[in-house]
């Protein structure tokens, strides 16, 4: 009994799968399906030429570029340690000869 109820629940999926299989065979035979495209390319490609940009694309590019550089420069100005390092460079005059590996003067 439990097996039959599981098969009944899977029946709609088998039905849809059959439509997908028949649709693929029909397209292979040359039948045309429903085309849901909005025509050709929005901007036709041109061989070895810079693409023709719309005014909207130029404005969007300028906006995102300005936003990116503002963010980079803002973060660099206010949190430069993230780029340059978190710790101050040590003062070499404070280093001892022992730390530098220099033997004491009294040794021959």
Curated annotation (Swiss-Prot):
Q: Which domain of life is it from?
A: Eukaryota
Q: What's a GO biological-process term for it?
A: mitochondrial respiratory chain complex I assembly
Amino acid composition bias (Acidic residues), ranges on this chain: 96-108
Q: Name one Pfam family in it.
A: NADH_B2
- Transit peptide residues according to the UniProt entry: 1-36
Where is this protein found? Mitochondrion inner membrane
Report TM segments. none
Give the family from UniProt.
Answer: Belongs to the complex I NDUFB2 subunit family.
Role, per record: Accessory subunit of the mitochondrial membrane respiratory chain NADH dehydrogenase (Complex I), that is believed not to be involved in catalysis. Complex I functions in the transfer of electrons from NADH to the respiratory chain. The immediate electron acceptor for the enzyme is believed to be ubiquinone.
Q: What is this protein called?
A: NADH dehydrogenase [ubiquinone] 1 beta subcomplex subunit 2, mitochondrial
Species source reads Bos taurus
């Amino acid at each position: 009994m439990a097996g039959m109820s599981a098969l009944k629940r899977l029946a709609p999926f088998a039905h849809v799968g059959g439509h997908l299989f028949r649709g693929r065979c029909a397209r292979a035979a040359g039948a045309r399906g429903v085309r849901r495209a909005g025509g050709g390319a929005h901007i036709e490609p041109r061989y070895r030429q810079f693409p023709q940009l719309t005014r909207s694309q130029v404005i969007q590019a300028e906006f995102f570029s300005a936003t990116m550089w503002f963010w980079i420069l803002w973060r660099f100005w206010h949190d430069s340690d993230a780029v340059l390092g978190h710790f101050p460079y040590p003062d070499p005059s404070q280093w001892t000869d022992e730390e530098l590996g220099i033997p004491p003067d009294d040794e021959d």
